[in-house]
Amino acid sequence: MNPFWSMSTSSVRKRSEGEEKTLTGDVKTSPPRTAPKKQLPSIPKNALPITKPTSPAPAAQSTNGTHASYGPFYLEYSLLAEFTLVVKQKLPGVYVQPSYRSALMWFGVIFIRHGLYQDGVFKFTVYIPDNYPDGDCPRLVFDIPVFHPLVDPTSGELDVKRAFAKWRRNHNHIWQVLMYARRVFYKIDTASPLNPEAAVLYEKDIQLFKSKVVDSVQVCTARLFDQPKIEDPYAISFSPWNPSVHDEAREKMLTQKKKPEEQHNKSVHVAGLSWVKPGSVQPFSKEEKTVAT
């Protein structure tokens, strides 16, 4: 029998007995009732123990915070955006081309037009970390070590970390590294040099420094037509002037440059009264046409 119902029945019985005794004048207090002990139902024999549901494993993430499976696409998009910025900046005398085999490697060349390194043509390679843009700053290595205080005389690597001690995402860009590589040839810095000899000569014997710079420029020019160190279809290479090939390309470039200028001149020409004859600088040289009346 259900204990709840049995307890209710006994209570009714006790209540009726008390009422009868009250009618006869005999008051009797009932003893204190004790609550029945609560028990959990027995566990069935074939029941399985209840366990806490396991939470799904966290999705693998790359170092830049994106899902690991999206990492290559995110990196490719970042590098494409960086190259677009380089093109828009139009850095004077600096040309770069991403590698065919790896987007993390760019080939480039710097043309120095004036200053101590005038007429210098320096080829280089930019190495971008595989966790870009969250890693260290890109490395820039010249194909031939240039005699410069900030260029390692053995490896040819430029001290880029001097300007980018900590690479900051969404703040630093590769075009800034290229601009820095160009600027070091116009503004010489000798503090904490990678080439101590070049730094000392620049500070104490500028003439000898200039002589060594000229020698370095000549070496780079003499080896300009050498095959690229890295075998890649997009590596930058130079060849001697060939009129049958280069003359036509030169004319096309000059023609494309003249057309915008001609269109601009036509657009700014305004028709109106003038007292100067075309081709003359003398005032009132234009003949007036009389109208017959």
Curated annotation (Swiss-Prot):
Q: Where in the cell is it found?
A: Cytoplasm; Cell membrane
**What are the coiled-coil residue ranges?**
none
Matching PROSITE patterns: UBC_2
Q: Which GO terms describe its cellular component?
A: FHF complex; HOPS complex; plasma membrane
Region Disordered, as annotated, extends over: 1-63, 253-293
Q: Which UniProt keywords apply?
A: Apoptosis, Cell membrane, Cytoplasm, Membrane, Phosphoprotein, Protein transport, Transport
Which family is this sequence assigned to?
Belongs to the ubiquitin-conjugating enzyme family. FTS subfamily.
UniProt-recorded name of the protein: AKT-interacting protein
Look up and give the organism this protein is from: Pongo abelii (Sumatran orangutan)
Whichever gene encodes this chain, its name is: AKTIP
